[in-house]
């Protein structure tokens, strides 16, 4: 099938935001996406799904591309982010290890179970046809599922896409500012105190994304608002979600509130965020060296220099925060002068009271956030006119 013709049909239908991890079976479609659309190369397949989900919240129709060997990496966000929040994505997964066809031994088992994994996740799927007319009809069918807030995947056989040469890519290098070398004080603030400071800087152009566990629950108790999103499950994906949203909504301030256990799970996304460097995003790490919501088991965060890592990955500003006053000053500076920022605050494991879970359902959180973003977009258009 002619890759450019298929890609142009996708673009006509509104699919112009792509993210994923390469596969030789999909390389020509990936090349088209890089040449003609917005493409975000993800650190892993799960991050790609989360990035696409953030782009969807920002009004895009996202496409996720991956090899089937990485489909298992995408299971967590598909079942605990996209399913409960009812966030649709259009996926293309290659069929390496297709039974009856020669392939490398590492693809043998996944080739046998690829479609079974999709079935078990209740993801509708279809083998992508190599006939353009048929493929166009398949895209329209996929659209019907996506319009009902369901993900849809195409399983792609070898040789489906004809050659699409990759145009020369720019390789920007981001020069980060030197990290502040100050260390945290002995008396660490509580998470609730930090969240109150963060929430105090929220305005009508701010979106707050809180990682799974106690962070989201405590933010909910401080103030439940339509421009808050509380992650449930999909641990480690909050920064990926923030990247997708920041890239698709550059006129909004995206505040990502992460935890040490969460960030440790998907540290590769630091490099992806640093490369695409959305200036309207601040990534705040509240680090208590523990998995607090599961009993306080220790993480290895005390052995990791997150600030140096973020700086090395291309964050424009990376800094240690010594106190709540530092956090307040950091947010004020970022609000006044944007730039991709990573801020690390050591917090205690003490909690005032066990926080209750949000009463609002995840898909309701998504729907009201989408309405908030749409209102903000319309207000901006009205101001310009």
PLM-predicted stretches and their roles:
Residues 1-243, 247-248, 252, 321-324, ...:
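Thiamine diphosphate
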Residues 63-69, 252-263, 268-270:
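DG-centered beta-turn motif at the end of beta-strands
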Residues 208, 254-257, 284:
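Residue-level marker for buried hydrophobic side chains located in beta-strands
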Residues 79, 87-90, 266-287:
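A short alpha/beta connector and helix-capping loop motif
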Residues 151-156, 339-345:
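Active-site regions of oxyanion-processing enzymes, predominantly non-cytosolic
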